Amino acid sequence: MSEHKTFYITTPIYYPSDKLHIGHSYTTVACDALARFKRMQGYDVMFLTGTDEHGQKIQDKAADAGVTPKEYVDKIVATVKDLWKLMDISYDRFIRTTDDYHMESCQKIFTKLYEQGDIYQGEYTGHYCKLCESFWTDSQLVDGKCPECGREVYDAHEEAYFFKTGKYADRLLKLYEENPQFIQPESRKNEMIAFIKQGLQDTCVSRTSVKWGIPVPFDPKHTMYVWVDALSNYISALGYGNEKYDEYSKFWPADLHMVGKEILRFHTILWPAMLMALDLPLPKRVFGHGWLLMNGGKMSKSVGNVVDPVILCDRYGVDAIRYFLLREIPFGNDGTFTNEALINRINSDLANDLGNLLSRTVAMCEKYFGGTVHKVAGTEAIDTELETMTSELLGKVTADMDNLTIPQALMEIFAVIQRANKYIDETAPWALAKDEANKERLESVLYHLCEALRVAGILLNAYLPSTAPKMMEQLGLDASAIDVEKAAYGVQESYTVHKGEALFPRIDVAKEIAHLKEEDEKRKAAAEAAKKAKEEAEKKAAAPAEESNVDFTHEAEISYDDFCKVELRVAEVRACENLKESKKLLHLTVFDGERERCILSGIAKWFKPEDLIGKKLGIVCNLAPRPMMKGKYVSEGMIFAADTADGGCSIPFYSDDTPVGARIH
């Protein structure tokens, strides 16, 4: 393969409003398999993934958590990277839309489009879905709700900048007609054509009501609408509009954008229209895959019907989960996740077919030939089908991967594995071993099995990157054997096998389903309790205040500027003790995210020291140090506390997931 042969593949950049679920893993594992396969073919691959970190939803989530938006997304992004490491995702670059170089590129793109007249200022009046970050007209709503997610929308009216999407309607239709591979699957293309023909509206590309975003450089009261920001990542990550990288000319245009069907419209209408306006090449293919369903509905963080991939990987192994996602879901259509389907796929394909074939073959090689078998001249008619299937496998898998029919590629590989298992039954090696005259024939049979396993292992490396090397090791081969140029029958002259652990231990279906059902019930109960607690809190907050004997004497009014000088933060109590010198005071040592400080507080009457240690509470942390107890102690702040109706004292504590040092607003 020549050095200039490149392949650029991208996942959507994920929205880090919460931890990712198995549906996100599905997209990323599919891209990873394609990237790995192209590398095996000798391509210079750029595999891009990342996170889309701006927008109203994250701004609101951060405010609820009492942290800045950047602090909020930093925490989630760390879990995203940990997940991809766990799942053996071999990405080459991870982009964050909060990266300085990306913001530089976006501002240059926005300015260029404005200066050439493709972006103009106006006013937006219509409807907005916060969950989908989408604007909608009256005619686009379905029963008054968002046509994408079915949730409530709210009326929006604000000054905004617009991109002239409608200007490019005819060019987009021509693009689809002249490049039938541009949108896949075919059914998705028909949806986009219908959307354009109903009248393509210009696109709102800025907000004044959302501050968490990339500022419009020539009008900083506006921030860029999230889709313009997010879509530009595919070229900013290569160095377009910035000096961070210099790979735009090498890798652009992208060979494949892989996205969920719910964001296909932005990638096949808005994105190519922007590129047309910038006079840049268009991506070669955009594939809109289906949803991973659970209990009849799309998995969604906001709905809560999600499956944690970390839990699945810990219990069943990473490659088992990768295989299930790639094999079980019809690529391009919706697929359903169930515990039963997962376990049955592991048992049937991985444990019974693949695992048993390897263990039986290795065991027979050791039993009958001391572990070493050689290529034997001549074959019999019964060998021909297995030889042919093994030699033709690379071509079939290559065609399937080029066509993005990933499940079919795995079916082809496992067809060889299943044929090899059948070949054992047909040739009956145990019977051949009873007669010394059949020794050469027995060796030929075992060699055929080793060859089928070797070729299957080479190709499985793209999908099961931990399993393929284990297969090679048991066949007595090293990592250099995983080479597609060697993926044909008869290449390896001999084998010296080494018995290893079972690749995929068989699962007791009844016991496992019972366990998973119990765990599901626990999670549902916890979710229901959390929902109920939230509803109670909202109900209590909305209820009219009861009469009380609280003292409503007010202090003198202070200015807003004076109040802004007060620094309020969440602190954790590291130590607490009573003072011998005072029955009223407790001596607290708290950590405010930067340092430990001492605070003396008159709450000893109501709180025991051991009840406060480890708790998170609010403090005023920029008070001037105050000497107390005749200078023996210095108090460096105050804690939040409230008088109760019965003359007692109450302290508001913060939850475990509230970061120490978070600002209190």
Model feature map: region roles:
Residues I76-D92:
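A glycine-rich helix N-cap at a beta->alpha junction
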Residues A468-D562:
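Intrinsic disorder at enzyme termini
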Residues Q121, H127, E328, A341-G378, ...:
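Helix-rich, typically C-terminal accessory recognition domains appended to large enzymatic cores
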